[in-house]
Amino acid sequence: MTEQKAIVTDAPKGGVKYTTIDMPEPEHYDAKLSPVYIGICGTDRGEVAGALSFTYNPEGENFLVLGHEALLRVDDARDNGYIKKGDLVVPLVRRPGKCINCRIGRQDNCSIGDPDKHEAGITGLHGFMRDVIYDDIEYLVKVEDPELGRIAVLTEPLKNVMKAFEVFDVVSKRSIFFGDDSTLIGKRMVIIGSGSEAFLYSFAGVDRGFDVTMVNRHDETENKLKIMDEFGVKFANYLKDMPEKIDLLVDTSGDPTTTFKFLRKVNNNGVVILFGTNGKAPGYPVDGEDIDYIVERNITIAGSVDAAKIHYVQALQSLSNWNRRHPDAMKSIITYEAKPSETNIFFQKPHGEIKTVIKWQ
């Protein structure tokens, strides 16, 4: 048994504590790792609040180590041609089960769901907020760009964006989505929310040629507006200014009332990507006119969750590109750096938060 410090919850009940745990060293592993930075997102906070009923502890355990947005350092590794001691790596969150999608490396599209697949720090598999991690090389993605530094901790949330655009590429082919110049230039993309995930969606949308607007029901901070401006992203307080004629709508809020409010602004042949989840959000009474609007305009609504290993690789490539073009803006995405003992950050967001990370070492 290895005694180590960890941040744990009791899923799905919730709660959080920074404590000492005993974790057995596995008989077989490829790499021994330690966390450098761990990101905190709405999923972590939802778990701590007891708001995510789908979460659960590993079998036979009465706790779950939190943390899925991880940047790890290799402390030791078996002989291989990919990673070595001292390298920085990003671990895959979702681990495969036995379905056909899982068997081909697409556990993000698991055909069975729980308990076939597991997600580190979320469903049945301990996360990365602990001193020591043992893992297999196939579940690690090497950070090739030494200039990224702590920005590489954004790989995990960004891989969700890469996957969502893969979904968009597939479903948008049901009609001619591109403009008459064969590009997406001038097509309108609206992102509901202004947290870190929304920022990453907006940057990726700009890369693809979209005219991108992030929206929320309040005005935004100067820091957020400055970052948006540098990337060419607009912002709208939708209580004052509701965007119209939307081609691609992405929801990061998980709030059905807000989503349906914007859905009625989507163009013919438009696409809606649902990404945010919020099990405690109030219901929305969908009526016949809502259904008519979707059907008569050939609107496609698609949920998108998690990602495959290829999307982690794509995310790291995008982070490197953005960091070269907008180094100051990318540094500004991480707005607060906490210590492991600061568990209050799971209950209260620091003022002006875009992304809060825990510096583990």
UniProtKB/Swiss-Prot annotation:
Sequence positions that bind NADP(+): 216-218, 275-277, 304-306, 349
Keyword Coiled coil: no
Residues reported to bind substrate: 43, 119, 156, 160, 306
Thermal dependence of activity, per record: Thermostable. Retains full catalytic activity after 9 hours at 55 degrees Celsius, and at 75 degrees Celsius the half-life is approximately 3 hours.
UniProt enzyme class: oxidoreductase
GO molecular function, one term: galactose 1-dehydrogenase activity
The protein's required cofactors: Zn(2+)
Catalytic reactions of this protein: D-glucose + NAD(+) = D-glucono-1,5-lactone + NADH + H(+); D-glucose + NADP(+) = D-glucono-1,5-lactone + NADPH + H(+); D-galactose + NAD(+) = D-galactono-1,4-lactone + NADH + H(+); D-galactose + NADP(+) = D-galactono-1,5-lactone + NADPH + H(+)
Biological processes, Gene Ontology terms: galactose catabolic process via D-galactonate; non-phosphorylated glucose catabolic process; protein tetramerization
EC number(s) reported in the record: 1.1.1.47, 1.1.1.120, 1.1.1.48
Protein residues bound to Zn(2+): 41, 68-69, 156
SUPFAM superfamilies per UniProt: GroES-like, NAD(P)-binding Rossmann-fold domains
Keyword NAD: yes
Highest taxon of the lineage: Archaea
Keywords: Carbohydrate metabolism, Metal-binding, NAD, NADP, Nucleotide-binding, Oxidoreductase, Zinc
Any Pfam family: Glu_dehyd_C
InterPro entries per record: ADH-like_N (IPR013154), Glc_1-DH_arc (IPR026583), Glu_dehyd_C (IPR031640), GroES-like_sf (IPR011032), NAD(P)-bd_dom_sf (IPR036291), Zn_alcohol_dh (IPR050129)
PANTHER family linked: L-THREONINE 3-DEHYDROGENASE (PTHR43401:SF2)
Family: Belongs to the zinc-containing alcohol dehydrogenase family. Glucose 1-dehydrogenase subfamily.
Primary role: Catalyzes the NAD(P)(+)-dependent oxidation of D-glucose to D-gluconate via gluconolactone. Is also significantly active with galactose as substrate, but not with mannose or glucose 6-phosphate. Can utilize both NAD(+) and NADP(+) as electron acceptor, with a marked preference for NADP(+). Physiologically, may be involved in the degradation of both glucose and galactose through a non-phosphorylative variant of the Entner-Doudoroff pathway.
Assembly information from the UniProt record: Homotetramer.
Designated name of the protein: Glucose 1-dehydrogenase
Organism of origin: Thermoplasma acidophilum (strain ATCC 25905 / DSM 1728 / JCM 9062 / NBRC 15155 / AMRC-C165)
